[in-house]
Amino acid sequence: MSHAPRYAELRCKSCFSFLEGASHPEELVGRAAELGLSALALADVNGLYGIVRAHAEAKRQGLPLIVGAELVVAGLAPGRPARLVLLAQDREGYAGLCRLVTRAHCGEGWTGAPERRERDAVAVPFEAVAAGARGLFALYPGADGDAVARLKDAFGRRAALAVTRHRVAGEEARVLAARSAGRRLGVPVAVTNDVHTHARARQVLQDVLTCVRHGTTVDRAGRRLFPNAERTLKGPEELARLWSDFPEGLAAAADIADQCRFRMEEIRGEHPLPPVVVERGALAGGVEVATSSPAQAAREGARTATPSLSLRASLPAERPAAPEPEGPAASAPEGPASSEPGEPGLAGAGGGTGAAAGTDRDGALAGMSLLRELVREGARWRYGGEPPEDVARQLARELDLVESLGYASYFLTVWDVVRFARSRGILCQGRGSAANSAVCYVLGITSIDPVRMGLLFERFISAERGEPPDIDVDFEHERREEVLQYVYQRYGRDRAGMVCEVITYRGKSALRDVGKALGLSLGQVDRLAKLIGTYEDLGQVGPELLAQAGLDAADSERVRMTLALARELQGFPRHLSIHVGGFVITRRPLCETVPIEPAAMPGRTIVQWDKDDLSELDLLKVDLLGLGMLTALSRALALLARHRPAPASPTAVPHPDALATIPAEDPEVYEMLGRADSIGVFQVESRAQMSLAPRLRPRNFYDLVISVAIIRPGPIQGGMIHPYLRRRDGKEQVRYPYAPLEPVLARTLGVPLFQEQAMRLAVIAAGFTPGEADELRRVMTHRRSHEKLAAMKARLVAGMAERGISGADAEEIFKQLLGFAGYGFPESHAASFALLVYASAWLKRYHPAAFACALLNSQPMGFYAPHTLVEDAKRHGVEVRGVDVGCSGWESSLEGAAPGRPAAPGETAVLRVGLHAVRGLPRAVGEAILEARAAGPFGSVAELVRRARLSRAWLVRLAEAGALGALAPDRRDAVWRSLAVEADGGDLFAGLAPPEPEVALPAASAADEVSADFATTGLSVRGHPMALVRPGLGGDRIRTARELGRLPDRAPVEVAGLVIVRQRPETARGIVFVSLEDETGIANLVVMPDVYERFRPVVRGAPFLLARGRVERSGKVVNVRVDSVAPLALAPSMGARARDFH
């Protein structure tokens, strides 16, 4: 029996070659280890997108992973650009590889925001490859003599030719040509297999992907498809047989692999953040501050300075009601800094990520000096003087840990970004585990006092965790772009990039692409795709559903294959998008750590790794997130500042930049939330939250914290909601598993809801340090390592035994910990969001017009469409007026009793819908109308057209929307007349023909008017559609939403309405929840799985529903359990678009 040779596969594409490879990186690595390969090189096309996933799996398998990429190179060989595989030999080579991939996507010498190229147009010139060849090994799958000579000149002994043997015509001639060129030019020739799949069974999917890439079908693809399944991973024995005539080719591949010693582990936690440079003696407390970017720091005298923000001393309430608007700092620079590259290292530079990563300890100490001074100033600002003793101790402890771990620059970077936002009047607030940090609180990053709330700092950072911290900051979503561009311009695009998000195939998209590739008709593909929701499992598509769609898998082999292949395709990457807010910022050029490419959105660049990739390598990121509610709150406060009530009003308006001044703990606010009057209120407007509210009956801020946390998948799956509510109602005794745990669980009535409680339980019951408790939480949450979990259990049980807890009791406590450590919600995160719950609820309670107006102007956001927000405002006594070219601004606004006039002090504000509500109307057209109206009101439609230079199309659009107001009160007449008006305001046929006789158009009915409103604006201020159609629904048989509350439990009932929300949460085991709106309110339907399957098309698609079922009552919570549903026949346009959540 012959001994198998050593062999390493050097050319391997994964699915991250985007439609070129048909296997996940993890599958390729696992199969390579199974086959006994000595190493595997992952070389995806123009990218390192999948390399971290492959690296993680290679660590688990113990397989050496070579980092590479297959670049499209222009100018290497005659004709079309050639493919060239580059493999990193060392850290320098890896940096060069990242630079070359970046160059391919961004072009030469990019400094601004490069334009995105189509994937087929991404290429790099050979001159750039030759210039960046150090530390790289080049593998060329060709035999052109001139190209081989050029490669040898550029790479020397670090170049080789690649040959393959796939049993196709003409292949042997190419192998002979390559071997001949190699001998002639002294270049080694290595055997490779140009791998596209990890197993032969994936070849069918590979063919489908090829068809998708070329926009063709399997019947028409021809030679674009591989003729066989030979491009799969093969073991050394199989290749030895295949290449028995050329064993030295296999040896060459193994030798090349031995030369490529770079491993991804080398960049773990490598890059510190760039410093935040502050001039000596220029700290807070009313003293002017200047900060400098790395680019500025490289140029002498490049400093910017502006007057500092005033530091308003204010002692926070027992439980802060809303985020503070200012911070312990000077102002941000007047404008973004230059983005020229420069090496940092000036005095005052912040520290990096630890000495192990090469941090300059002098720089770190300087950074800590700055951070300590800012914390001192911030503590005085937060507490109106010296902080309480317990706060001072906590701050000192946190700062010592931050210094020992080298994270000063991370805190300073986030502080700098938050400071910039506040200096521009952009509302922002930190959340997540960062709210456990007293340092973040006094720096103004977060708004929760963690000491007063008893939060654990180790949930945020611990020495035992060995991972970098993660600070999430929310900004107004409409102004976040200002913050993002500030980061780009301050640190330079070569040192800052947004984290990518990999958009993968889901059920619908997989079905559509596979169906088209297999040649199904567009109708068949459409019917298949409509069978499932976006995120539903294709395994749910059975014969019954296919029959509903007019398809039969038994009769159609292609339908069966479509379903099977679509299931395989689910989870494959389709393209890259932008992460919701993650930024990577580095001291050295970022493109030496990870390739950068332009994002689809202009002005943005992204790295080729997602957040999980960065986490795997312990690379720091800053999360700058957009939050619609912050936009709405900012807009509401600005509206109130402009329409301030009379000074004697009991609901004095807060300062527009100071949510913190909203009155805290208002009983009226809690009473409103307790009756589930929460449409538009942050986090508590969902159907589940509304069902919870009457049972929870919040009475204070901490009740809102619990409300935010309890309606989550974890507590629901853990069965914690009902025990907590029973104990709150006095129907169940409060019990504690171990008496000393009462202080930990008392606030949640003995029911563990928060991750911090799990950590404190381990500290008290087993003597864990807080850092060890956080490690326990992480092990229990992820449960990836049975060994770690077993070790933690042994440590926990031993600690409890030392405290007199018996083995049986200890086992029970461990089971409880295991049960809720993973699903528990972070208390700090819930508290941060609860601030916004209270602030938005206060505005809704006391200023419903301003609140509704702000919500309309902040769309898209929240749970409900504009129509539902308008109906809710009307139920709260707000007068709403429709779109009118004579009164409306571009956005919705507040006006007084006189149309188009601002409300006088003390006058009740009226909500005027803005021109932005008219579907399809460009903002430029709206602005032109406003500019023309500023010179005086319009006297006629012709004058409007002439002065605003409106085209006939836009005039007709406005007329259809009923927006011509007093100029043409009758909508039909307005549309008719608009069709005969030219852009200059004259009649189209004036002077060419006798005057047209007046046309007596029939008056539109109320139903026609409402239908036209919905068709053109998505909402109607005239009335609800159900009020118009109810008289024809059979008298009192069909109940209104308001009447449901008076019916007894299990009473048979029929209800009808407009579908405003559909939900099918994963935790509901197939149950669908539908919210129906009528003229009196909202009715909640519960559609069980069997009913849903029978009426799936109606439930999923009908805009209006008539439902029959029985009343389900639980206290004040009323639902309708549905037995059957039917579409309610109304005009197709008469309805808003439902918000569907799957």
Swiss-Prot record:
InterPro entries: DNA_pol3_alpha_NTPase_dom, DNA_pol3_alpha_thumb_dom, DNA_pol3_finger, DnaE2, DnaE2/DnaE/PolC, DNAPol_HHH, NA-bd_OB_tRNA, PHP_dom. Residues 291-361 are annotated as: Disordered. Residues 345-355 have a biased composition (Gly residues). The keyword Kinase does not apply. It catalyses: DNA(n) + a 2'-deoxyribonucleoside 5'-triphosphate = DNA(n+1) + diphosphate. The keyword Phosphoprotein does not apply. One of its GO terms (cellular component) is cytoplasm. DNA polymerase involved in damage-induced mutagenesis and translesion synthesis (TLS). It is not the major replicative DNA polymerase. HAMAP family: DNApol_error_prone. Belongs to the DNA polymerase type-C family. DnaE2 subfamily. This is Error-prone DNA polymerase. The gene is dnaE2.
